[in-house]
């Protein structure tokens, strides 16, 4: 009897330790709130859908109309403030409960300053980021929202630099996702 109890407690302990080391979303679909913000909303939904499609529904999303019903809440702002001591275009914060993800907050900065020359002088102009300047960031932040960290592989959307040239998910991104959810 002692051996059975010992094996049982070791099993339960290992189960809890594994969960604590590997937080992830346990319920599917993951409910996502994306506020109406013109083309930015469309692109953000496309970013989540790209993860679902490329992963063959390993992660699934359902878009909801209220942040109170969502696991992942997206917010659009002109500029992201300080994100973990880094000036960023996007930022994701995760909350865990019982060792698993409970809530995620994704903030996307929609504006950028562009310098142009007018009458021989430099003028700073505020404009909305184009798809080329924001979609890679949205894919990257959606990856963080499902629990992925940064990758050291430069051709991964989870690589923290050069997101302007990255507009798609790669096999490396899927490797990271499968490692997290299998």
Predicted features and spans:
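Sec-dependent N-terminal signal peptides
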Residues: 4-13
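Sec/Tat signal peptide C-region and signal peptidase I cleavage site
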Residues: 15-19
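Fold-level signature of zinc-dependent metallopeptidase catalytic domains
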Residues: 21-45
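Surface-exposed aromatic
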Residues: 30-31, 106-107, 112-115, 154-167
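Solvent-exposed, acidic/flexible segments
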Residues: 37-44, 127-136, 151, 166-170, ...
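Metzincin-family zinc-dependent endopeptidase catalytic domain
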Residues: 42-138
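Catalytic Zn2+-binding segment of zinc metalloproteases
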Residues: 142-157
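Post-HExxH zinc-binding segment in Zn-dependent metallohydrolases
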Residues: 159-182
């Amino acid at each position: 009897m002692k051996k059975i109890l010992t094996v049982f407690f070791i099993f339960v302990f290992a189960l809890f330790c594994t969960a604590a080391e590997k937080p992830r979303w346990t319920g599917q679909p993951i409910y996502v709130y994306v506020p109406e913000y013109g083309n930015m909303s469309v692109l953000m939904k496309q970013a989540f859908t790209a993860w679902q499609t490329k992963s063959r529904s390993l992660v699934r999303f359902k878009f909801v109309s209220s942040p109170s019903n969502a696991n992942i809440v997206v917010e659009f702002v002109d500029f992201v403030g300080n994100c973990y001591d880094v000036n960023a275009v996007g930022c994701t914060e995760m909350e865990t409960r019982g060792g698993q993800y409970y809530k995620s907050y994704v903030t996307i900065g929609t504006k950028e300053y562009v310098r142009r020359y007018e009458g021989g002088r430099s003028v700073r102009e505020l404009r909305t980021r184009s798809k080329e300047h924001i979609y890679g960031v949205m894919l990257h932040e959606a990856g963080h929202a499902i629990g992925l960290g940064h990758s050291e592989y430069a051709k991964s959307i989870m690589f923290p630099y050069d997101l302007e040239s990255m507009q798609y998910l790669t096999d490396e991104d899927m490797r990271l996702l499968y490692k997290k959810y299998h």
